[in-house]
C-alpha cells in the first residue's frame, strides 16, 4: 500500500487525514473502515474505526500490524465499491474517496525522531578525497549517522527556504525507512520485522556552514537542520521490499542530473536499524535516512541549484518528491563576538 497524510478543506476548516493512494484517488482509510463496519452491521462503526484504524499516521503506526490489516480491508472495501461505480460513504454520509487534485498531500508523517546515515561507500570515498584524505578505517566498523531536526519537515510541492547564511545550498537524494514497531537490542534479522515501509527523503544542506561545523568535529547542525523533504507516501514493505533496490533519479528544472540504485548501499537496512537499537529504543514513527548515493547531490556533481529552481527526486515504486527552492533573505554570516 501507498499510505499518505492528506489535507481536505471543509466548512470547519482544513482537516488532516490518513489515506491510501488507489488508482487516481485518495481513500480516507478511517472513513472507509467506518463504512465497512456499518455495512457489516456494527452498532458504532465510527467509534470502532477510530479505535482500530485512527485517522493519524503516528497513531496508526502505534497500533502495528493489526491497524495495517484493517487498512487493507478498508482499501479493498472502498475499491470494490468504486469498481461497481458506487463510491462508499461514511456512516453520516461523509466522503470516503477523493480525487488526487481535490486534496493536498502533506509529508506522510511527522517523525518522532530523525537519523540520517552515510551508507554509500562511493559517496563517502568522494567526500574524504575532496578533503585530501582517505576514508577512515572506522567507517567500515559500523554505520555512521547523525540526528537531524525532526520538526523541520517539508512535504511534497512545498517551497523550501534558502537559509540567509549559506551560498552553497544543496540537495541529497535519499530513501528513508520508517520504523513500525518498538524495538531494542535487535538482531539484523529482527530489525527487518520492525520496518513499516519506505519513503523519499531530500536531505537539504548548506555546504559552507557544514564545512565550518565539521572542521570543529561537531555537527552537522545549522548546515542541515533548516529543512528536510519527506514524501510523497509511505510505501509498505510488501510493496517496496525489505531491502529495496530501486532506481533513483534527480531532476532539476525538468533536466535529469543524476541517477543511481538505492540498493548500492554498503550497509543494509537490517544492520542499520540493528545498530541504532543497541542500548537504545526505536519507536514507531522514527525515520532513518540512507544517506545519498554517489552523484546524488550537487556537491558530488559539482553543480549547484539556484533560488527558484525545482528539485525533483524520483524513485521507482516510491513516487516523486518535488520542492521549489525559495529565495534567500538578506545574506547574513553566523560569526559572533564572544559573549
Question: What is the meaning of each model-derived region?
Answer:
Residues 1-12, 21, 31-252, 256:
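Active-site microenvironments in enzyme catalytic cores
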Residues 2, 18, 119, 174, ...:
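Residue-level marker of beta-strand positions
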Residues 11-18, 28, 322:
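Short N-terminal binding/cap micro-motifs at the start of the first secondary-structure element
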Residues 22-25, 32-36, 111, 262-267, ...:
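A short, sequence-level motif marking secondary-structure junctions
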Amino acid at each position: 500500500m501507498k499510505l499518505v497524510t492528506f489535507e481536505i478543506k471543509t466548512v470547519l476548516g482544513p482537516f488532516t487525514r490518513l489515506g491510501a493512494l488507489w488508482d487516481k484517488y485518495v481513500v480516507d482509510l478511517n472513513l472507509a473502515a467506518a463504512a465497512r463496519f456499518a455495512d457489516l452491521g456494527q452498532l458504532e462503526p465510527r467509534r470502532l474505526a477510530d479505535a482500530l484504524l485512527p485517522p493519524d499516521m503516528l497513531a496508526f503506526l502505534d497500533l502495528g500490524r493489526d491497524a495495517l490489516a484493517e487498512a487493507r480491508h478498508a482499501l479493498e472495501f472502498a475499491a470494490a465499491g468504486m469498481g461497481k461505480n458506487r463510491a462508499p460513504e461514511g456512516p453520516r454520509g461523509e466522503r470516503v474517496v477523493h480525487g488526487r487534485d481535490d486534496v493536498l498531500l502533506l509529508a506522510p508523517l511527522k517523525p518522532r525522531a530523525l537519523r540520517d546515515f552515510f551508507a554509500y561507500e562511493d559517496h563517502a570515498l568522494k567526500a574524504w578525497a575532496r578533503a585530501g584524505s582517505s576514508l577512515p578505517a572506522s567507517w567500515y566498523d559500523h554505520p555512521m549517522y547523525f540526528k537531524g531536526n525532526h520538526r523541520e519537515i517539508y512535504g511534497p510541492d512545498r517551497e523550501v527556504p534558502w537559509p540567509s547564511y549559506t551560498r552553497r545550498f544543496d540537495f541529497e537524494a535519499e530513501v528513508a525507512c520508517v520504523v513500525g514497531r518498538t524495538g531494542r537490542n535487535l538482531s539484523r534479522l529482527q530489525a527487518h520485522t520492525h520496518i513499516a515501509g519506505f519513503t523519499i527523503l531530500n536531505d537539504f544542506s548548506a555546504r559552507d556552514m557544514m564545512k565550518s561545523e565539521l572542521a570543529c568535529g561537531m555537527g552537522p547542525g545549522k548546515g542541515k537542520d533548516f529543512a528536510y523533504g519527506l514524501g510523497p507516501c509511505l510505501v509498505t514493505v510488501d510493496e517496496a521490499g525489505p531491502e529495496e533496490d530501486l532506481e533513483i533519479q534527480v531532476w532539476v528544472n525538468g533536466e535529469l542530473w543524476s541517477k543511481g540504485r538505492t540498493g548500492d548501499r554498503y550497509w543494509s537496512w537490517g544492520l542499520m536499524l540493528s545498530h541504532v537499537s543497541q542500548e537504545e529504543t526505536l519507536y514507531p514513527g522514527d525515520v532513518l535516512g540512507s544517506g545519498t548515493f554517489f552523484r546524488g547531490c550537487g556537491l558530488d556533481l559539482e553543480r549547484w541549484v539556484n533560488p527558484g529552481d525545482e528539485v525533483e527526486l524520483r524513485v521507482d515504486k516510491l513516487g516523486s518528491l518535488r520542492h521549489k527552492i525559495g529565495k534567500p533573505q538578506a545574506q547574513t554570516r553566523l560569526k559572533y563576538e564572544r559573549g
